[in-house]
């Protein structure tokens, strides 16, 4: 009898799970067009939850029969809530369409602290510019796309090859750290021409931090950083095509496609091609107004779905460009010769980068990248051939403990640079000696929430530079929300930067001037602080206004400034015997009216100077005031949108090359404005067209010439005195030598454009 009772108990025990009837709830989550990943899906009040995968699918397994409330949650979208009753044998399929909160989505940021938060909640002021903003003034690359961002100026550094850098708050390009998906992939050599190789088609959004960011990104982020966030596979269309042509015979084409490999892997591939092969010389100086360019960029991103929605993505980009500028009758056979002047640059670049979340309970993320950049260039008879490889890896631990939100990380970067100049040769013997810099580092950052209105962020980073040894960069940030809901943020930090003249100053390569280095150059050191005030106003009928005001101050020791003025034939480099300062005020106003009219206005006042031997000198090629605007208006009745964009710059001091140089010492007030009309009345299509440089501004106006001695680019006919100074002759009345560095704006006038954009989801 006891055995029978035991048998019955065992049978009932083993059968008990079968007596509880259960089913699965599954479906797909989208925003109406794109799949949404990492959405929290749960049954309210019960321990059943999951996250949507990379293609938006979710599944709640073994849910017992009963009545529940199914809910979803993700930052930037309205919450979904639905009452459901499970009482059948069939699995429940419930697809969810979430409506995005436009303002919140636009303001999700990650660059300030390496954590994704709403922009208003971030202790670090971050500006966000998404792909829709970039499309309001169509361009082929990152360099051109930033023309209408307040406080940022893409600076053209050569009238012939059109190399340039991106300046934040008046500081030259090398003080700006450019990241791709949070990684320092854009190396110093690639800033010379590589910025034109980052196509807008691969950009989901651009995040800009103006001011100190050294504790998590490294000491080189002195002036600020630009973080290019690449497109997500889940939100990209299955196929897209975007192409436009201009009246200058420029043709830019972007094509992308997405496909899946099995159920776990999603692959996004994009190709950009820019073609301009039309030598234009509208100012009749015998030289091309802008350089001719043929480039292709191929981008591919793999997203691998893993258990528990752990992250794993891999991406690669290949970039190849040929560009030349010079005398309009230059051909490849003249490359490097002294009969017809040309600047010819061949660039090849390969990048591989990824992000992997470790399979642990703790939030551990490993990011890694490898890039190689090769440049083969001729500037007249001067040859510059350089190669740079950079390997990078970083492990980050994201941990919350009570009111403390920690970020702890370790990073390692190895940079190898070699060229055919004396910069990478031994002082004695002339043997090749590539520059090798090994840079391991650790950092700790903690965000402490004092109360509901106040937070403080502290951070410190230690790097060991194999050349310059120990580098310590602290960081401090404070945020307070006032009673009127306005926000005040204070950020301070330090910076440290070693200078590579030949990758940072294009004028050192042209051969037009001789480079003189007076001493062993010490690394630059800086202290900077930024005070920010933000206030958002909400009105009836979905109207929004955001006001943003910042004051910034940067103090430099050991500042290295190229001296063009002491001797017109030389570029003299040395650490200044004094200090440098960059300070100013910046204001942004963003209006959003009923989703039909958007207005973004910005203005920046700058005071950038060097004080040496009790003498204060303004930094050349630096404006005291700049403004930018983007105005968009939809005419729904006709399916049209009008975009009006532009910028304005105050006069800046320009580099003359002699006392008799007849060119203006300062630039005029100047502005480049654009207008675009977009028709979106055909499903999945946009047809757009407009005018760039609407009022046909050219830097050569009111100047006798831009390029000095364009008729004698090899200086074959100049005469010099016994001290090597150029003297006046009938052929050279201003005692000048060839010099193309007098440049402050693009030498490209008004042009019309027409394009077609297609997306299939």
Regions from the language model: what does each represent?
Residues 30-34, 39-44, 73-77, 87, ...:
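Short, acidic, small-residue-rich periplasmic hinge/interaction motif at the N-terminus
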Residues 61-62, 165, 183-210, 298, ...:
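Short acidic/polar hinge/loop motifs at secondary-structure boundaries
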Residues 92-96, 142-145, 164-167, 193-199, ...:
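N-terminal periplasmic accessory domains that precede
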Residues 143-184, 204:
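Extracytoplasmic beta-strand/coil segments of soluble accessory domains associated
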Residues 276-297, 303-364, 370-389:
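Flexible loop and strand-edge segments within Gram-negative outer membrane beta-barrel domains
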Residues 365-377, 481, 489, 522-575, ...:
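Membrane-embedded beta-barrel scaffold of Gram-negative outer-membrane proteins
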Residues 449-452, 547, 551-555, 575-656:
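Gram-negative outer-membrane beta-barrel transporters
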Residues 648-655, 679-761:
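C-terminal beta-signal and adjacent terminal beta-strands/loops
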């Amino acid at each position: 009898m006891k055995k029978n009772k035991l048998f019955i108990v065992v049978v009932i025990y083993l059968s008990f799970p079968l007596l509880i009837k259960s089913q699965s709830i599954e479906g797909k989550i989208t925003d109406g067009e794109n799949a949404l990943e990492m959405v929290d899906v749960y049954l309210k009040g019960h321990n059943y939850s999951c996250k949507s995968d990379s293609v938006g699918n979710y599944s709640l397994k073994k849910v017992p029969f009963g009545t529940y409330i199914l809910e979803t949650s993700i930052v930037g979208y309205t919450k979904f809530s639905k009452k459901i009753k499970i009482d059948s044998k069939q699995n429940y399929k419930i697809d969810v369409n979430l409506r995005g909160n436009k303002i919140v989505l636009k303001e999700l940021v990650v660059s300030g602290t390496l954590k994704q938060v709403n922009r208003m909640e971030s202790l670090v002021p971050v500006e966000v510019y998404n792909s829709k903003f970039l499309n309001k003034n169509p361009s082929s690359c990152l360099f051109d796309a930033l023309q209408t961002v307040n406080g940022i100026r893409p600076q053209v550094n050569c009238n012939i090859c059109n190399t340039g850098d991106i300046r934040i708050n008046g500081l030259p390009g090398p003080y700006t750290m450019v990241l791709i998906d949070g990684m320092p992939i854009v190396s110093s050599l690639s800033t010379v021409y590589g910025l034109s190789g980052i196509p807008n088609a691969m950009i989901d959004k651009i995040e800009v931090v103006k001011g100190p960011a050294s504790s998590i990104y490294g000491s080189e982020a002195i002036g600020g950083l630009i973080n290019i966030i690449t497109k997500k596979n889940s939100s990209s269309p299955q196929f897209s095509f975007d192409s436009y042509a201009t009246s200058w015979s420029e043709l830019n084409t972007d094509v992308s496609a997405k496909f899946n490999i099995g159920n776990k892997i999603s692959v996004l591939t994009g190709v950009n091609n820019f073609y301009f092969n039309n030598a234009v010389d509208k100012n009749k100086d015998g030289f091309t107004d802008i350089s001719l360019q043929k480039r292709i960029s191929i981008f591919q991103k793999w997203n691998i779905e893993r258990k528990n929605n752990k992250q794993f993505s891999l991406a690669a980009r290949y970039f190849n460009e040929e560009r030349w500028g010079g005398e309009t009758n230059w051909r490849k056979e003249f490359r490097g010769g002294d009969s017809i002047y040309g600047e010819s640059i061949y660039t090849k670049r390969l990048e591989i980068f990824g992000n992997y979340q470790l399979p642990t309970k703790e939030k551990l993320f490993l990011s890694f990248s490898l890039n190689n950049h090769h440049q083969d260039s001729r500037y007249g008879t001067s040859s510059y051939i350089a190669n740079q490889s950079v390997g990078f890896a970083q492990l980050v631990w994201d941990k919350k403990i009570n009111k403390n939100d920690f970020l702890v990380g370790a990073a390692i970067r190895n940079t190898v640079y070699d060229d055919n100049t004396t910069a990478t040769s031994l002082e004695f013997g002339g043997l090749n000696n590539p520059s090798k810099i090994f840079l391991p580092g650790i950092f700790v950052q903690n965000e402490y929430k004092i109360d509901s209105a106040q937070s403080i962020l502290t951070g410190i980073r230690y790097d060991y530079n194999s050349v310059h040894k120990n580098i310590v960069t602290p960081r401090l940030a404070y945020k307070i929300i006032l009673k009127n809901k306005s926000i005040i943020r204070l950020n301070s930090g330090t910076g440290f930067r070693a200078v590579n003249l030949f990758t940072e100053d294009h004028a050192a390569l042209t051969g037009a001037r001789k480079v003189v280095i007076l001493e062993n150059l010490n690394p630059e050191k800086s202290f900077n602080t930024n005070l920010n005030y933000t206030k958002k106003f909400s009105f009836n009928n979905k109207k929004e206004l955001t006001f943003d005001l910042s004051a910034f101050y940067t103090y430099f020791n050991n500042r290295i400034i190229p001296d063009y003025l002491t001797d017109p034939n030389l570029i003299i480099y040395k650490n200044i015997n004094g200090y440098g300062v960059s300070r100013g005020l910046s204001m942004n106003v963003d209006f959003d009216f009923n989703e039909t009219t958007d207005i973004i206005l910005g203005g920046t006042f700058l005071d950038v100077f060097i004080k040496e031997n009790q003498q204060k000198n303004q930094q050349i090629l630096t404006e005291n005031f700049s403004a930018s605007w983007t105005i968009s208006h939809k005419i729904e009745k006709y399916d049209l949108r009008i975009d009006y964009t532009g910028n304005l710059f105050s006069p800046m001091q320009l580099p003359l090359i002699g006392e008799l140089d007849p060119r203006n010492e300062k630039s005029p007030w100047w502005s480049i404005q654009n207008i675009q009309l977009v028709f979106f009345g055909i499903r999945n299509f946009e047809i757009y067209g407009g005018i760039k440089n609407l009022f046909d501004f050219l830097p050569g106006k009111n100047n006798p010439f831009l390029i000095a001695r364009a008729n004698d680019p090899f200086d074959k006919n100049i005469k010099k005195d016994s001290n090597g100074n150029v003297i006046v002759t009938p052929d050279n009345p201003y005692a000048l030598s060839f010099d193309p560095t007098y440049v402050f704006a693009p030498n490209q006038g008004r042009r019309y454009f027409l394009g077609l954009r297609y997306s299939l989801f």
